[in-house]
Amino acid sequence: MSSDQLSKFLDRNKMEDNKRKVLDEEAKASLDIWKYVFGFADIAAAKCAIDLKIPEAIENHPSSQPVTLAELSSAVSASPSHLRRIMRFLVHQGIFKEIPTKDGLATGYVNTPLSRRLMITRRDGKSLAPFVLFETTPEMLAPWLRLSSVVSSPVNGSTPPPFDAVHGKDVWSFAQDNPFLSDMINEAMACDARRVVPRVAGACHGLFDGVTTMVDVGGGTGETMGMLVKEFPWIKGFNFDLPHVIEVAEVLDGVENVEGDMFDSIPACDAIFIKWVLHDWGDKDCIKILKNCKEAVPPNIGKVLIVESVIGENKKTMIVDERDEKLEHVRLMLDMVMMAHTSTGKERTLKEWDFVLKEAGFARYEVRDIDDVQSLIIAYRS
């Protein structure tokens, strides 16, 4: 075969490969599109499992056998025919497993690590059931249908954000006027705190030498600070939030509940903890909060511990394994949540965090990976 013939042969092979790739992409797209048509089924079925306490019914069943459909429908007072369909879907999604009973005469359901994370009664640092229930309230779902309006609106902000457009006020004002939603926000934040604070604490040892007081800004129920003072018992903790939140905060050992507004001032302390607060605000407000944090801590040992997501700068080129890819996907979903539910909030890249921290006067900071959706950003007063 001459070099010219070889070149033509290789070109034909390359063209055939390209055609196959196009066909493969088309075939994949013809299936993938359906998850955007019916994607709401995932969250609706998960909410159904939480509402009926299906994971608890399986976990608490007196028999060591898999729980049959008849037993499960009796335990949760559900229609067997409808429950069978819900469970078929959730088994297919990997939330539950269906396996044969020991005698092999029937099949039954068992929990998985994922289904146990849908237990509304569990407060073990794994369940995110309160978060699912909060995000699936009609009040939080409705703004998603207005997402395109804010994307297409002028930069000057003449079009109200999705939540404001639906409810006539921002999410914080709405929560203040509707205690049920405020309670759901607080419980959603608390269940995430139970999950992530142990990871944060594991990355904090050595940071609190000489620290005797710490304020949790936007601390909600106070549970986060309660966990931190248990981990670092020499620290006096202050749970700082708006009056209507502090009014229903827990009374915990080593924690004092203090009402106030982070936009006005923050109680003086050695260190500040602020988790999932700054992403609720645009750069201008974020810088103001950070400046108030900086003013509240002393020059020598003062530090601000920020627990927030850090979005990768280079998209998938930064992703090294499946877990990293899934974590990044959650961070990007959170950014969509901020667009739907807050007026100016957003998730930030490291470059964007660098900007707001330096604008607030923090010349030095570090980012510690805690193998989670969130990272620990430590900003030093000096």
From Swiss-Prot:
It is found in: Cytoplasm. Coiled coil: none annotated. This is Acetylserotonin O-methyltransferase. One of its GO terms (biological process) is defense response to fungus. It is an enzyme of class 2 (transferase). GO terms for cellular component: cytoplasm. The active site is at residues 279, 308, 347. The gene is ASMT. S-adenosyl-L-homocysteine binds at residues 218, 241, 261-262, 275. Keywords: Cytoplasm, Melatonin biosynthesis, Methyltransferase, S-adenosyl-L-methionine, Transferase. Pathway: Aromatic compound metabolism; melatonin biosynthesis; melatonin from serotonin: step 1/2. It comes from the Eukaryota. GO terms for molecular function: acetylserotonin O-methyltransferase activity; protein dimerization activity. It catalyses: N-acetylserotonin + S-adenosyl-L-methionine = melatonin + S-adenosyl-L-homocysteine + H(+). Its EC number is 2.1.1.4. InterPro entries: COMT-like, O_MeTrfase_dom, Plant_O-MeTrfase_dimerisation, SAM-dependent_MTases_sf, WH-like_DNA-bd_sf, WH_DNA-bd_sf. Disruption phenotype: Altered circadian dynamics of stomatal aperture. Promoted seed germination. Increased susceptibility to Botrytis cinerea. Belongs to the class I-like SAM-binding methyltransferase superfamily. Cation-independent O-methyltransferase family. Methyltransferase which catalyzes the transfer of a methyl group onto N-acetylserotonin, producing melatonin (N-acetyl-5-methoxytryptamine). Does not seem to possess caffeate O-methyltransferase activity. Implicated in melatonin-dependent circadian dynamics of stomatal aperture to minimize night water loss and promote drought tolerance. Prevents seed germination by promoting melatonin biosynthesis. Promotes melatonin-triggered defense responses to the necrotrophic fungus Botrytis cinerea. (Microbial infection) Promotes melatonin-triggered defense responses to the necrotrophic fungus Botrytis cinerea. Induction: Expressed following a circadian rhythm with the highest level 4 hours into the light and the lowest level at the end of the night. Induced by cadmium. Induced by osmotic stress. PROSITE patterns: SAM_OMT_II.
